[in-house]
Amino acid sequence: EEIAQFMRDMDTSGRGEPGIFNRRAANLNKPERRAFAQFGSNPCGEISLRPMQFCNLSIAVARADDTLESLMEKVEVATIIGTIQATATYFPGLRPEWKKNCEEERLLGVDLTGQLDSRVAQDPFSMMKLREHAVEVNKRYAELLGINQAAAVTTVKPGGNSSVLLN
């Protein structure tokens, strides 16, 4: 009964899955592309989505033997996949705002999981280079596909066991 009540409460709240969320800290760290009144959170709080929006998550797996070059190749593939995913904006059954928001920002969520296994992925300079590469790859492929460049490209998602499963 307790679990059933928990699920009902989650459903009727309209907020999605529960969690601990510090709104003050989130507002201090919100991206510039978000107006104060628009910013809130959702189950993907680290992406800073608009209401009625989602991103195109893709993951590159960092391994102990990766070099900056091998991680750049992995991030490039993940970015291309995310950019292609961003072309899919036909959402029957959802309000038109979903399509509008997703087409305007074409958000990607290129994630690098397995960071603790890789010295390169722990290096701030390498991470900056990987982010810059992802942004450039998205820009190039968005132009080829005739869509907007993503307003945001990279993220760090809590990946759980995906780094083990995606070996």
Give residue spans per PLM region:
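Internal maturation/activation junctions in enzymes
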Residues: 1, 89-99, 107, 112-158
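Polar, glycine-rich mid-to-C-terminal structural blocks
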Residues: 1-15
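Exposed alpha-helical structural elements
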Residues: 2-6, 56, 70-73, 126-129, ...
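Short amphipathic alpha-helical surface micro-motifs
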Residues: 2-5, 36-45, 136, 145-147
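Short glycine-cluster motifs
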Residues: 7, 33-35, 133-135, 166
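Active-site and channel-lining beta-strand-loop segments
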Residues: 10, 151-167
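Function-dense linear segments that define catalytic or interfacial modules
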Residues: 11-119
